[in-house]
Every structure is written in structure tokens, then in C-alpha cells.
């Protein structure tokens, strides 16, 4: 934590230089906010709370309750300096039968998340964001909970940001501990499933026009301890850097579609990479493209990327082909949606034979394939029809039936953590199993929601022939945020 504060202290020169050279920025950003790499904002709320914009509530006439006043607390008479407060309380229960897919007593996790944030704006050009979090867990058959589940208190985010407009270009830089989601969700995510979310430390800078953008970054992950703030340190063994471009597809090309194309070139370095029981330095490069958005009633999220580099003395040659799409079965925004996702993550070589062909996501969404954390996009092929419907404006129901296979039967089945299910590399049947996924979200208000989730993983021969079994996952949580 001290090194993070020292690093933040070194940034005033950068901030002052950028503020001096920038013109006064308009309140609206040039590039579409939904595609700027900061996540989705719905009803004013974003998973990354600093991505929210509550400036309208600086006008007392637009506030509807006392909590609205916390969104713009003026620190100067003019209101140029103000702070936006945010917070979340989430109570959750997870019940998992046969944890780790072994025939064993069920696990119950009773989880508490508490988060508080303050976003201090100093004029149009400068802001400082700080966020602290607490994670608590109790229950049965817990084992040794990770520091992302049990943590007395953590400085989850702390950064300084400077931005402005130079001519017809928005420019900016953010330095410190932050969430980073500028890429496909299966590749980079803040992992909201964790009680303490995934964060990184370093620099992100950008330049954006109305139709294109370039973002560059150099980041190291946070290595959390489970006590106070002093044991939450910058991980010295891992580093993630790269460049992401963004282009707005002209609306006239597809009849008014809102589509975006994001090519990216990344590098991930890991001094303690692990595959097949072997540990050593790894450097992995990513070159790919993310295409996403809406075209009429169709929503798409497509990613293709090639990965290469070295792990110890082994060359890397891997691919991700990730395709999710759905169609709205009606004209209203609340109409049911029918779709499917089909994904390919190459595999092979994890145990030292030939090239390492296992695809690897830097820190992607770890619950997309299984809330039980039993699958990850490495040596994996999946196909899943999906359906969602809102029988009432406040209730959203969704379902999926996912079939999963190994891409290479000479390599293992991998968990969300990246660790293999030991012994599966010796089974020569490709079928991993099927996953039934059901979810209901009841949004009582923009601030309060209740979620229920059920999954059943029916283990296939890739797992059962190595001694693993099926599992049920049942969870419920209530979340209040402001």
C-alpha cells in the first residue's frame, strides 16, 4: 500500500501538464461512452463506480430522495470542486454439492461485501477516486478462503485521473490502483463474483475522437492479503501491457446499427507461470479483434485472437474464438431474447509435449461457463443456446444449456483458476459435460436487487473417468448500492 501511495505522489507533474495544455472539456465525451472500455452503465449505475456520471444531481431540483444529495457534495461555492459518494452492501449465500467435483459434503458460503467510495472532482480536468472494501465469509466446508473472499479491509481502488480536450480529441490518463475492463469480458474483467474485485496498478492513457480511440496501458495486478491494507501489495511477478484501438462502424453500413470494432495487441508477462505441474517464466502476446454492439434486433459480442510467446523453453501457439449473439423477439426493449454462444479455446501441450497450445485469458470473467468455477476458456469447446425474458418490468429470467468438450484430449480440463483437474489429461474422451444455468433478477429499485441462480453440471466422461462427479450450485444474494 505504501508503494502505491508513493507512486500516486509522483503524478502531480503529469496532471498539471495535461490540465495546462487541454482546453475546457465539454461535459459529454466525444467517443460513445458505452464503447470506451469502461463497462456498461445501466440506470446510471456501473460496476466500476467511477464510470458513473451524476453531475445532473448537482442541481437540487433534480434530486428525488436524500441519498441523491450524496452524489454531488459541493466543496466550493461555485461547485467546481465536488465529491460523489458511492457504496454497496451485498449479502450472499452459495451452496455447492460435491465441491471440486469430488464426492464430498456440500459447501455453504455465507458472504458479506461492503464497499465505500469517494470520487473527488477538481474542475473539469482532475479527479481522485478512492474505494475501500470489506469481505467476510462463514459457513461449512470452507477450506482456506482466498483473500478475495475474506479480507478485513482493502483499498480496492485509489487513482488520480487527468483529462481534457485538445482540439477535437479527448485525452486522458489514469494512474494508480484501478479496475480495468477495456476488452472482451472473457479476457479482462473486474470479476464481480469475487467479494473483493480484481484490480490492477499502473497507468492507462487514452486519446478519443467521435469515431475512433486508442488506449494504452501498463499494469500489474494487486496481490491481496486477508488482513488490513498493508498486506495488499502490487504483484511483482506479473505484468500486463498493451494497446487497444476502437472504431465506430458507420451507422449507414448496417441500417443504423450501433457496432464497434476494437483491435488489440497485448502482452502478459508472468515470472511464475504454471502448466502441467511445471513452473517458470512466461511471456504471452495477444493479437485480436473484438466486435460488439447492436444491429436492429440482433446483439453480438465476437472475439478472435491469436496468442504466441514462450513458457520456459516451450513456444506458445494458441487461439480464442468467442462468439455470443442473440435476437430480440419483438420490437420493445423488454421483448424476449433468443440466442446462443459458441466458443473455442485451443488446448494441448500443457504437460510439455510440443508447442503450448493452451489459450489463456489474462483475467477474464471467471463465472461465464460455471458459477461453480469448474470451467475456463482453455482447452475448451462450448455451445449453449440462451433465452431471456422479462415477464414484468422488474423481473428478468434467463436460461442456458451448455455442452462442453475438450479441444485436445491429450490435455486436461481446466478450472476457472487455471489449475487442471488432475488426471483428466490421461482420459481420451473429449466430452466434459453439460451445464444447465437458470437465473432470476428482481430489481426492486435502481438501488436494490435480489438475484437467484441455479446450475447443474452433469459430468461427462472426461471428468468421470478421472474420478470426478456432477455438482449442483445454488445461490441467492441481495445487493443495495447508492
Predicted features by range, described:
Residues 58, 95-112, 121-168, 186-189, ...:
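Surface-exposed loop and membrane-interface regions of Gram-negative outer-membrane beta-barrel proteins
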Amino acid at each position: 500500500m505504501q508503494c502505491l501511495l508513493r507512486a500516486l505522489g509522483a503524478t502531480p507533474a503529469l496532471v498539471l501538464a495535461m490540465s495546462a495544455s487541454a482546453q475546457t472539456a465539454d461535459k459529454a465525451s466525444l467517443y460513445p461512452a458505452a464503447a470506451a472500455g469502461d463497462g456498461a452503465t445501466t440506470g446510471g449505475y456501473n460496476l466500476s463506480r467511477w464510470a458513473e456520471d451524476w453531475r445532473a444531481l448537482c442541481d437540487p431540483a433534480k434530486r428525488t430522495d436524500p441519498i441523491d444529495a450524496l452524489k454531488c457534495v459541493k466543496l466550493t461555492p461555485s461547485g467546481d470542486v465536488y465529491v460523489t459518494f458511492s457504496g454497496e452492501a451485498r449479502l450472499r449465500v452459495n451452496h455447492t454439492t460435491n465441491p471440486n467435483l469430488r464426492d464430498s459434503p456440500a459447501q455453504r458460503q455465507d458472504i458479506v461485501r461492503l464497499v465505500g467510495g469517494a470520487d473527488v472532482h477538481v474542475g473539469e480536468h482532475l479527479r481522485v477516486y478512492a474505494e475501500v472494501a470489506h469481505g467476510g465469509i462463514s459457513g461449512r466446508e470452507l477450506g482456506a478462503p482466498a483473500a478475495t473472499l475474506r479480507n478485513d479491509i482493502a483499498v480496492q481502488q485509489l487513482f488520480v485521473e487527468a483529462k481534457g480536450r485538445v482540439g477535437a480529441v479527448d485525452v486522458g490518463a489514469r494512474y494508480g490502483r484501478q479496475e480495468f475492463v477495456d476488452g472482451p469480458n472473457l479476457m479482462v474483467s473486474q470479476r464481480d463474483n469475487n467479494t473483493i474485485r480484481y484490480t490492477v496498478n499502473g497507468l492507462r492513457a487514452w486519446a478519443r475522437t467521435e469515431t475512433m480511440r486508442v488506449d494504452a496501458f501498463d499494469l500489474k495486478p494487486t496481490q491481496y492479503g486477508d488482513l488490513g491494507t498493508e498486506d495488499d501489495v502490487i504483484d511483482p511477478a506479473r505484468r500486463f501491457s498493451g494497446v487497444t484501438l476502437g472504431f465506430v462502424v458507420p451507422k449507414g453500413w448496417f441500417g443504423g446499427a450501433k457496432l464497434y470494432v476494437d483491435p488489440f495487441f497485448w502482452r502478459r508477462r508472468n515470472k511464475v507461470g504454471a502448466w502441467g505441474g511445471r513452473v517458470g517464466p512466461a511471456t504471452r502476446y495477444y493479437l485480436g479483434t473484438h466486435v460488439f454492439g447492436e444491429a436492429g434486433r440482433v446483439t453480438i459480442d465476437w472475439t478472435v485472437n491469436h496468442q504466441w510467446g514462450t513458457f520456459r523453453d516451450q513456444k506458445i501457439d494458441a487461439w480464442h474464438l468467442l462468439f455470443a449473439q442473440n435476437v430480440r423477439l419483438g420490437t420493445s426493449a423488454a421483448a424476449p431474447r433468443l440466442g446462443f454462444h459458441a466458443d473455442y479455446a485451443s488446448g494441448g501441450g500443457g504437460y510439455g509435449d510440443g508447442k503450448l497450445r493452451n489459450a489463456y485469458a489474462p483475467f477474464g470473467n471467471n463465472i461465464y461457463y460455471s458459477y461453480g468455477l469448474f470451467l475456463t476458456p482453455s482447452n475448451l469447446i462450448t455451445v449453449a443456446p440462451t433465452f431471456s425474458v422479462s415477464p414484468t418490468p422488474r423481473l428478468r429470467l434467463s436460461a442456458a444449456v451448455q455442452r462442453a468438450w475438450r479441444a485436445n484430449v491429450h490435455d486436461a480440463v481446466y478450472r476457472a483458476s487455471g489449475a487442471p483437474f488432475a488426471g483428466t489429461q490421461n482420459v481420451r474422451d473429449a466430452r466434459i459435460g453439460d451445464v444447465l444455468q437458470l437465473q432470476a433478477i428482481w430489481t426492486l429499485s435502481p438501488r436494490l436487487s435480489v438475484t437467484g441462480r441455479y446450475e447443474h453440471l452433469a459430468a461427462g466422461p472426461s471428468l468421470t473417468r478421472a474420478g470426478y462427479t456432477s455438482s449442483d450450485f445454488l445461490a441467492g444474494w441481495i445487493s443495495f448500492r447508492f
